[in-house]
């Protein structure tokens, strides 16, 4: 799942769902980084995309938190 999917569908979810999504992405990022260190990663562009997706979701969560105050 990349930015196109996150932009529309996931940013409308609740904060709990977004936090779960961040955890899922972080787990996937960990797996990709492990594969990279072992040398079996074929699609290295996914690491950058997932890092950016995590940042986008966290930015939305922070904006919601500041907006609620």
UniProtKB/Swiss-Prot annotation:
<keyword id="KW-0689">Ribosomal protein</keyword>
<keyword id="KW-0687">Ribonucleoprotein</keyword>
<dbReference type="GO" id="GO:0005840">
    <property type="term" value="C:ribosome"/>
</dbReference>
<dbReference type="GO" id="GO:0006412">
    <property type="term" value="P:translation"/>
</dbReference>
<dbReference type="InterPro" id="IPR036049">
    <property type="entry name" value="Ribosomal_uL29_sf"/>
</dbReference>
<dbReference type="InterPro" id="IPR018254">
    <property type="entry name" value="Ribosomal_uL29_CS"/>
</dbReference>
<dbReference type="InterPro" id="IPR001854">
    <property type="entry name" value="Ribosomal_uL29"/>
</dbReference>
<dbReference type="GO" id="GO:0003735">
    <property type="term" value="F:structural constituent of ribosome"/>
</dbReference>
<dbReference type="Pfam" id="PF00831">
    <property type="entry name" value="Ribosomal_L29"/>
</dbReference>
<protein>
    <recommendedName>
        <fullName>Large ribosomal subunit protein uL29</fullName>
    </recommendedName>
</protein>
<comment type="similarity">
    <text>Belongs to the universal ribosomal protein uL29 family.</text>
</comment>
<dbReference type="GO" id="GO:1990904">
    <property type="term" value="C:ribonucleoprotein complex"/>
</dbReference>
